[in-house]
Regions:
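STAS-like cytosolic regulatory interaction modules
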Residues: 1-103
Length: 103
């Protein structure tokens, strides 16, 4: 399940719950695309309630982020799932936020 929260005029937060697999990634990708078309430029992904992040889901999430970065957007995964292996993947490949966006 994916819920969105607008944090500012150009920043949106996606709350993802449940298992994160290829279908969830596709749903998230469509939501990100729609939000980008509406003018959002900064994207946060809260994965703290994800119960399972499989390899294909992680790959799809990285592709979503790469697409945002290639088109001038910024993104960050916050509170990754507790699995050590997945945390390492998320920390090394999914943390692409400009320094100006940090609090």
């Amino acid at each position: 399940m994916i819920q969105t929260e607008q944090l500012s005029q150009d920043t949106i937060l996606f709350h993802v719950r449940g298992p994160f697999h290829q279908n969830t990634a596709k749903e998230l990708g469509l939501s990100v695309f729609r939000s980008y078309r509406l003018g959002f430029k900064a994207f946060l992904f809260n994965l703290s309630h994800v119960s399972l992040l499989d390899g294909e889901g992680a790959r799809q999430l990285a592709l979503i982020g790469q697409g945002l970065q290639d088109n001038g957007g910024t993104w960050k995964v916050i509170q990754p799932p507790s699995s050590v292996g997945n945390q390492l993947i998320l920390r090394t490949s999914l943390q692409h936020f400009s320094q100006a966006m940090w609090n």
